[in-house]
A protein has these predicted regions:
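PP2C/PPM-type serine/threonine phosphatase catalytic domain
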Residues: 1-179
Length: 179
């Protein structure tokens, strides 16, 4: 049995909490459970709206998806959320440029499947803390390429510039992790 708890925090820099969380510990569509965290892009229009629309769209798609593979279900749901945000932004100038990060997961048997777009993170906490997702950010790319070390990255002025987001481009590239 899976038990969860979620909480969001506005942090010290923002005036508006752009986080949106969804947790379903029981079957939804063809998934045994699903957990989603989205964080609207802070410097962009309608970040809080983007995160809510993305999660709501994903939940709706997961609930009605005929696909069987958990990877395909999550990829489809994130893709539909991406399309929905792009459609809404095209109709309203106030929504132009909106986007959100997404981390979605499902526990299937003894495996945790994680889908990730952006720089929101999923950690496993047991006897130690282990970061599962990899940030899609400018600074993380600099670390991966050897341009800067992780200590420098933590304080880098551009650490919040993300390279992937749901709603940012016509197609969304999703990373998956199987734990």
């Amino acid at each position: 049995m899976v038990k969860t708890f979620s909480i969001t925090d506005i942090g010290k820099k923002r005036k508006l909490n752009q986080d949106y969380v969804y947790s379903c510990e029981t079957r939804i569509g063809n998934l045994p459970n699903v957990f989603i965290v989205a964080d609207g892009m802070g410097g962009q229009n309608a970040g809080e709206y983007a995160s809510k629309v993305a999660v709501d769209t994903m939940v709706e798609e997961i609930a009605h998806c005929a696909l069987q593979s958990p990877v395909r279900i999550l990829r489809h749901a994130i893709s539909r959320a991406n399309t929905r945000l792009r459609e809404l932004a095209a109709k309203d100038v106030h929504l132009f440029g909106m986007g959100t990060t997404v981390v979605a997961s499902t526990v299937v048997g003894r495996h945790l499947l994680v889908a990730n777009v952006g720089d929101s993170r999923l950690y496993i906490i047991s006897d130690r803390i282990r970061q599962i997702t990899k940030d899609h950010s400018l600074v993380e790319e600099m670390v991966r390429m050897g341009g800067i070390d992780e200590k420098t990255a933590r304080h880098h002025a551009e650490k919040n510039i993300i390279t992937r987001a749901v709603g940012a481009d016509d197609e969304v590239n999703v990373d998956f992790f199987d734990v």
